[in-house]
Structures are given as structure tokens and as C-alpha cells.
Amino acid sequence: MKHKVTFEQDGFVRVPGFCDAEELQTIETALARFIAERVPALPVEDVFYEDKSDTCSLKQIQRMHEHDDFFAQLIEGKPKQLAEELLSGQVVCKNLQYFNKPPALGQATPPHQDGYYFMLEPCHAVTMWMALDPADEENGCVRYVRGSHTRGLRPHVRTNTLGFSQGINDYGSEYDCENETACPAQPGDLLAHHALTIHRADANQSTTRSRRALGFIFYGESAREDAEAHDIYQKHLAWEMAKVGKI
């Protein structure tokens, strides 16, 4: 319950050592296999590269649990249990993602609220981010605006950031700056935030270190998605990314 109290108060919670060394090694082995064997056959809209001609610039993979039994079991385990605690009830597993900020290539993640992308009523959802590499201020750790989940959805505008197509257009108020909190993480540490919590991350300034992570998204059972609007948005986004050679 301690995680739930912090989550409801701050809009996010840090869970150090969510996965231990043995669990991480199992995940790393499965991830390497997935990238080698599954990624080449995935739909183009599920795989993003900083530079499509360079496979080493892999930035995001979407819906991994729909393409592989290991990751389907992973999202149904400890992450789902935590989501049910944080949202006080049954949840729906929506996405298991891979994120990377490659050395010197990884762009900044614009300030945003996941709820803007989710298109839910009510906006009852949680996103989790589990570090696979050490994440710090040099390579772009996640930054949250404490308490922002209580202040509603902010206006968003189109961005040019791959994988984060919308960002808050008026970010930087006194409230934002005073309440922004950097959240460094070690491999296996997990961060969970409410769908209305504002968060961002700086670019990867390191020339040698990646900043890899897995993401888990869960909707509360009461949340209803505007499926038609979401589908139109996703199709248009895929068209735009294909046009500029990102997928």
C-alpha cells in the first residue's frame, strides 16, 4: 500500500529493485532474441529507428506482448499486480514497449501527459518504465512534475520527436519548474506514473552509454477508449513517420 499512497499523492512512484539481477538477465536474453528474430518481421508502425538505415539506432518497439510469449507472460506478472494495486482494481494490459536513447543520438523527450495519447474517459491508467541501463541526468533520466496529475490535461501540440508526437505547448511555468523532479534509476528499478502526470527527459548527452528501458501500460477497467479517434490518430502518425523514413 505504500506505493499507492505515494502514487496518489505525487502522481508517480519509484520502486527500486523491482526486478533482481537474475530476472534482468532473463529479460536481456529474451530481448536480444526478440530484436534478432522478431523485429525484422514486425509491422513497420511497431518499430522506430532514429535512422532507419542503421539498425543500431533502434529507438522504440511497440506491443511486444502481442508478438512473443515471453513478453506476454512478463506483462501479466509483477507489472500487472502493481498496476492493480496503484489503480485499486482490475486492469487491462495495453502495451509493452522497448525504449532506447542511443549514445549521442537519443533526442529529448518533450514534456507530455500519456493521457493525451490514450484518449480515455475517465483517464484512469498507469504507465511503468523499468530501467535496463543506468539512467542519470547525462543520458536522459525521466523527470516528473510532482502533483501534476491533479491539475487536468494540458494543451498539447505536434512535435518532431520520434515516438512522442505531441508535447505540452506551454510547459515551463513556475509550478512546472518548482515541482519537476529528476528520477535517476539503476537496472531493475521501476518508475510508475499516472496517465495525467507530466513527464519529460533530456537528450542522451553521453557518447558511450545507451539508456534502454521497458515500458508497461495498463488501463483501469473503468476507462473507455475513443477507439475510432485513436485509430485515426495512429494511422496518420504512421503515415507521417513513413514519409520521413523513420519506420
Predicted features, each with a name:
Residues 109-116, 195-201, 216:
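Histidine-centered catalytic micro-motifs
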Residues 128, 193, 199-207:
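Short beta-strand His + acidic residue motifs that chelate non-heme Fe in jelly-roll/DSBH
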Residues 135-200, 223-224, 239-243:
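Double-stranded beta-helix
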Residues 142, 202-211, 225-230:
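Short conserved catalytic/interaction loops centered on acidic-Pro-aromatic/His motifs
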